[in-house]
Amino acid sequence: NDITVIDSNPDLVGQLTNSLDISGITGCASHPDVLESAGARDCDMVIATTQSDETNMIICQVSHSVFTIPRKIARIRSQSYLEINYSDLYQSEHLPIDVIISPEKEVAEAVISRLEIPCAFEIETFLGGKAQLIGISIDSTCPVINTPLRQLSQLFIDLNAIVLGIRRNTKLFVPDPDDQIFGDDQIYIFTTLEDRIRTLEIFGKVIQKGNRFIIVGGGNVGLTVAKKLEENKQNKVHCKLIELNRKKAELAADSLERTVILHGDGLDLNLLEEANISQANALLALTDDDKTNLLTCTRAKTSGCELVLSLVNDSSLNSLLKPMGIDAYINPRSTTVSSILRHVRHGRIRAVYTIGDAEAELIEAQVLGTSSLAGKTLRDIDWPEGVLVGAVMKGNEINIAKSNTVLDEGDIITVFYNSEVVNKVEKMLEVGINFF
């Protein structure tokens, strides 16, 4: 790929060009001359992710009108621009944006997904909603610790689940069949939805959904999460939202129907007790300040809250999560990056999910008839080191990959791999320089 980054900060451009194999331009990305200097006339795609919605819109408009760039992706944060009533705004004859990425919406959906499996610290759905990647922490009570993964496959022969990754002492690696799971490991399991509960039980985890939640932070993410919780008609939710800024608290009160709004500091123990923190099933720390989120979670945990979830923007803080008692976290940047990557990869790549701080990826792709993979068994394919195929979907049937599984044209496969081999994996899956 030939990638050019445009930014108004010359120091940032310098850092990127020195550390990555990319080109850089300093300037305003919405200006036609700057875009042209970046190679817009020969560009296949523009991704506008500045801090300004309006700038991102202009970038897409100029890219379309002046340079006829075929695909345009924009990050749009303001909820006003995302109202369903105004969806026609983004038609090609009006404002030509092909894909809109809303970070707040993506993060809110990730939060709701975590609440479905409280014992998981990370969840992502694949294969048309029929399978999930689930990250769980292992403790000494796990029934299958110190058991080789090969033996697990033999013990639970009909189980549609596989361990794709293990994080041990902060290092994430793709396991071999003879590797074992130890206490204090974090593991990533790929499983079908049908076998999800049984799989978690094998590793000593039980899904216990709650309906009493406390949200700290009434910004776009907190407000979106509260609205989604209110929409849950099957499980009547009791939700309280704490917001320090009075104007935001008043806006939340006007926007929400059943959520109780508390104006104050989420770190205030008296306020947490007023919110009945000891009886809450989960506290969601969703402010835009990492330290506030982490400290709020720690205070909630020591006050008896069952589950605490934090937004963490700075990945260097990840090593503090376990000592601080944080049960689950969401990195907004990683969530947004994964969303963007779904739309920029080559070949028939249908989905990409970034693991941790870009340590690894899980990719969902279609096997093309002209691909080097078609017609081969998995054991006959020369995969790079650090790659593991999770599942193969043939038609509507999903099966965990075996060494004798044959890949046919049209099959959908999920592949887990270390970030160092991204280009090699993509090369194996693509058949040309075409998006989608």
Where are the regions a protein language model picked out?
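Cytosolic regulatory regions of ion transport systems
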Residues: 1-436
